[in-house]
Amino acid sequence: VLREDFLLTGTKESCGEGECGACTVLVDGHPMNSCLVLVAELDGKHVLTVEGLARDGRLHPLQEAFLEVGAVQCGYCTPGMLLSGIALLNLYPHPTREQIRKEMEGNICRCTGYARIADAIQLAAERINGKD
């Protein structure tokens, strides 16, 4: 529905089984694999896709950090990584590497860019919440 009816193509379609995280969206602030959610289950809920991250033409600080540290390789996993990363930052304002690893384990990067993704999350945390 997101891609075909609303033309929100940032949410990627990949495994269709909730295994890869490429289709991650935030539902009421919580990451969910959109491939596993029925539209009827979302009635009255706030759904955020990667298209909704930028505000007034400015990228979200996590998007900026991804670009700055080179956390984007092929880019296919990036929308899901960003949304899961934002949920993580809402949960842990100053996440440790272990917290990042645990919270991001539902998102797969086939290019193995995990270290830079974690770097970007920690950089964004510093910019959003100040240094710990």
Predicted regions: what is each one?
Residues 1-132:
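Signature of N-terminal electron-transfer/Fe-S-associated modules in redox systems
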